[in-house]
Regions:
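Short-chain dehydrogenase/reductase
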Residues: 125
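Conserved "HGTGT" condensation-loop signature of ketosynthase/thiolase-family condensing enzymes
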Residues: 1-122, 130-136, 142-268
């Protein structure tokens, strides 16, 4: 079965490296209590939904490592005091961010969090095929943050792990509003995978997935090497949507943690 197309009703993002003012958009009640990665996800979603006629009915979040800073703080507490803060623990759980977003934006339908390294965004888009028509529109958020500790740890990791974390300094939150209906005048997106390597090279499997998506249609395929950071795929999608460049772009990804590949296709 061919992966389902979803219409992209809207999109927005927070890229801290190029958006110094984004923190001014965090509500005071969130700024006091919630971790930075939640702030990134909230602002990206709030920008997207600012002019939405009604709140989404479901959501899917893709994140590779979740709230890294909260995980660090929880482990610091155990190391220094013998116990970790319950607040840090709750925030460090990957799907707690999706729950918080659902409460803030009054999303009372299905709520999924997908965690598979570089495939997390593709997994989130693909998971929308599980939702019934009554669960649309769907808010999809891809988000990962960077903390200094990761760069400090890289020299002490095995070479394979270090190689796949070397681009983890890139951070962003990208939000999409998807409709199950195919609306011709809107961009569309779909995803395939993740699919296990099963002895194949990542580049070979990525080409197979791309071929299954475009099925002979003229398309541009992003090199899998371009998708090394956890937010590479959603950022490439966001840049394509922002540029309004017409045509089909396929972005394959490979997650060394699951030894699987996925691919996302956007059409304008």
């Amino acid at each position: 079965m061919s992966p389902r197309h979803f219409s992209v009703r809207g999109f927005n993002a927070v890229v801290p490296a190029s958006d110094s003012a984004w923190q001014a958009e965090i509500p005071a009640h969130l700024k006091r209590r919630d971790p930075r990665i939640w702030h990134m996800a909230y602002v990206a979603a709030a920008r997207l939904l600012k002019n939405a006629a009604e709140p989404p009915r479901s959501m899917a979040v893709g994140t590779a490592l979740g709230a890294l800073d909260e995980t660090k703080n929880f482990l610091d507490g155990i190391f220094k005091d013998g116990f970790g803060s319950p607040k840090n623990f709750i925030a460090s759980v990957h799907n707690s961010m999706a729950g918080k977003l659902a409460l803030e934006f009054k999303i009372d339908g299905p709520n999924l969090t997908l965690c598979d390294g570089q495939n997390s965004f593709a997994s989130a888009v693909a998971s929308c095929t599980l939702f019934p028509s009554s669960a649309f529109t769907c808010l999809v958020v891809a988000v990962d943050e960077s903390i200094p500790l990761v760069n400090e740890l890289i020299p002490h990791l095995p070479p394979v792990c270090a190689a796949h974390l070397s681009d983890s300094g890139q951070e962003a939150a990208v939000a999409l509003l998807l409709d199950r209906r195919v609306i011709p005048e809107l961009p569309s997106i779909r995803a395939i995978g993740p699919i296990a390597l099963a002895g194949k090279e990542p580049s070979a499997l990525a080409k197979e997935l791309a071929a299954r998506l475009h099925n002979g249609a003229a398309s541009s395929i992003s090199p899998i090497e371009k998708c090394r950071s956890f937010v590479s795929a959603p950022l490439q999608i966001y840049e394509r949507l922002t540029s309004k460049q017409t045509g089909i772009l396929i972005i394959p990804s490979y997650s060394p943690s699951s030894k699987a590949c996925a691919a996302v296709e956007v059409s304008l």
